[in-house]
């Protein structure tokens, strides 16, 4: 409604201005009375007064609304920044503690890994030495077992040879017995033959002697003359027979001597064989005792080898179990560290989301302030345009009245904004930016739009922790207490462009002064409509 009233008033003022440009001629021509001019002037000033009152009321309402919004936003911003700072400090503290804990855990893990590696190397060296010693012992025992096996082979060969020798001895004994038996039989047979022959020869000799005696007796009886000759012949024959028998007896004696010699040789061989048998029996008993001792030694060595192998396998199993337990413990520690890292990642992601939400909320607040600043600039432009129109209309009225001869001519005013002008409307507009009073408690509804813009800029600077822009001594504004967040003076700086470029942290929006405009494309249409309404 106030905007429509403004437009209607503007149209009326334009029509009145046009009509009033023509009225002086009519007044000069028609010579109307001064009362009508006074009424017209009064109605004009009443209209101007109404317009200014309406605009003042509208500006006051808008300034009150903006002050209230600014106050609420200031409180929200303060609480939000306080919460953000506390949350961020707490999160940073937690992050630092967790980083320290992670670093300690990493160092502890590295130390445990190094310690486990050293213990593993020591155990490997220790058990490598034990394995090498056991392998040396094993090789030594294997050599001893090989020697024992070779001895066993020789013993087996000796047993085989023994069996053969025993068989040979048995054969020799059998042959000796058979030869002795044959010798005894041949000796007995020869003796029997000798005695038989001797007996036969004796019998034959007796028979012949008897026969010869009888024959000789008969022949002697028959032929005594030829008796001597026959006896001689018979004697010669007997001598020959006796020599033959003696020769046979010698041969038989020689044969008996040979048989006796053979018998003595056989007896000697028998004795030698008995001695060899006894010696072999002694060797066999010694070898049997050696075999028994070697077998006992082999059994003891096998038992020792089995015991050492079982002990070595038990040590290997213990080492494997210990290594498995250590690996499981290391895996458990690694799982714990991974879970801790995952928790850390989740917390970091949560912190990132929280920071993103905080930044989004901050950008929303900053966007709201940008919208407010843009609205203030639009209001500044509209109010300046409206002021220029009113000032130009008033100047035209004064000029018409002066042309009519009612008043003096006013000072010449320019409305194009040239720098050479001494009485320009822009000077009045620049005066609106100054602070006319220096009181402490100032209501924001009583401020002009230019002063409100400066307040917003100071609010942005305080919000983002930047120094306020440098003011001249004449135009330095005493900012009200209910607008400033902290106590103390603002730091002055001469670089206005840096302040304008660094108005926001999260978005570098180019906020210009009254000559530079913020692009309305950045501002949502709903916010523009709500702020303008």
Curated annotation (Swiss-Prot):
Residue stretches in coiled coil: 34-207, 246-368
Chain intervals with Polar residues compositional bias: 507-517
Compositional bias (Basic residues): 7-19
Keywords from the named record: Cell projection, Cilium, Coiled coil, Cytoplasm, Cytoskeleton, Flagellum
One matching Pfam family: DUF4515
Record has Transcription as a keyword: no
Compartment list: Cytoplasm, Cytoskeleton, Cilium basal body; Cytoplasm, Cytoskeleton, Flagellum axoneme
Organ and tissue specificity: Expressed exclusively in the testis and predominantly expressed in male germ cells.
Knockout-associated phenotype: Mice show reduced sperm motility and male subfertility without obvious sperm morphological defects. Abnormalities in sperm flagellar axoneme seen, with an absence of one to three microtubule doublets in the principal piece and end piece of the sperm flagellum. Motile cilia are normally distributed on the epithelial cells of the trachea and the axonemal structure of cilia is intact.
Subunit structure and binding partners: Interacts with MNS1 and ODF2.
Described function: Plays an essential role in sperm motility and male fertility by stabilizing the sperm flagellar axonemal structure. May be required for the stability of ODF2 and MANS1 proteins. Dispensable for the assembly and function of motile cilia.
Protein name (record): Basal body-orientation factor 1
Organism: Mus musculus (Mouse)
Lineage: Eukaryota, Metazoa, Chordata, Craniata, Vertebrata
Gene: Bbof1
